[in-house]
Regions:
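Domain-level detector of nuclease and nuclease-like folds
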Residues: 1-177
């Protein structure tokens, strides 16, 4: 899930953010408030490479397909003035699966030293609408925990010893909040 703002360096790259392969049903207030704020925080880390905070920042984002938002009825109307709903199988009325969680796996590198942090966020209307760093840290997890929850092997191209070490834990102090 690449945000449009992540791809402002050229028109074609930005257009790619609107492909169907980059779309996932999200509760409006979740997308527009909490998730957007988390994306902006991560964008500041990516853009801080120019200030030499990090040399590189790698980000993987998505929604769970192994855990779906079942039997959901929203309390806030969507743009079409309907309440968002899912059935017992976690699908919308049009048959789209709706993730119960959205995640980010983030890896930074500075002078050959790697740091990671993951976020495993419940797809909900009730998250803070003006989240702070502390609000984000409620859902911060190690990459190992994120891999356990999603079934995805993140950063598998790192040398095994580095991957094993950096994915085991995270420290909020490693990130420029």
């Amino acid at each position: 899930l690449v945000a449009s703002e992540d791809r402002v360096y050229c028109r074609d790259a930005n257009r790619q953010t609107f492909y169907y392969a980059n779309i996932s049903p999200q509760i409006g207030v979740f997308n527009q408030k909490y998730w957007a704020a988390l994306e902006k925080q991560v964008q500041t880390w990516g853009r801080s490479t120019q200030q030499s905070v990090y040399d590189k920042v790698y980000v993987t984002k998505g929604g769970t397909i192994n855990k779906l938002l079942t039997n959901f009825t929203g309390t806030l109307k969507a743009n079409d003035q309907l309440y968002p709903t899912t059935d017992a199988d976690g699908k919308t009325v049009r048959g789209l699966i709706v993730p119960a969680y959205y995640y980010m796996a983030i890896l930074s590198e500075k002078n050959g030293v790697y740091k990671t942090i993951g976020f495993y966020v419940p797809h909900a209307e009730t998250l803070p609408q003006k989240p702070t760093a502390d609000d984000f840290l409620v859902y911060a997890v190690s990459i190992d925990k994120l891999e356990q929850e999603t079934g995805i092997d993140f950063f598998c191209n790192l040398p095994n010893e580095i991957e094993k070490t950096v994915e085991a834990t995270y420290s909020a102090d490693d990130w420029a909040w």
